């Protein structure tokens, strides 16, 4: 008999197929079963693709691809929305902190705050600090969608 190994389940199935199904095979008249192949198909319908490997109809296979495709679209939409909201939220939240790092003296002065807002976008330090966290997500969004 078979020894227990990692492939024990497969071996048991193959032993079952050899012992049970072959004992009902109509090669000889000793077992008393008719040699009609339709009878064997009716009694053992899984014999055509053992175990569980019967091919599905083409319409069923195409419908099985539909949920996979829809879940892929939903996942992409969620990723895009999360990247977009994180990018906008980061710009809103970190605007004043970056402005304070770029212009520490003029940020304390209330009168020069308007000029500081306009000139901060031309400051290379501000641009560099604002673009580092989302450069990779911007790259992904540009080439994925």
Swiss-Prot record:
Query: According to its record, what are the GO cellular component terms?
Result: mitochondrial membrane
Miscellaneous comment in the UniProt entry for this protein: A stretch of 270 kb of the mitochondrial genome is duplicated within the centromere of chromosome 2 resulting in the duplication of the gene. The expression of the duplicated gene (At2g07697) is not demonstrated.
Membrane-topology descriptor:
Single-pass membrane protein
Cellular location(s): Mitochondrion membrane
Q: Does the keyword Transmembrane apply?
A: yes
What is the name listed in the Swiss-Prot or TrEMBL entry for this protein? Uncharacterized mitochondrial protein AtMg01230
Q: Keyword annotations for this protein?
A: Membrane, Mitochondrion, Transmembrane, Transmembrane helix
User: Which ranges does the record mark as transmembrane?
Assistant: 63-83
The species this protein belongs to is Arabidopsis thaliana
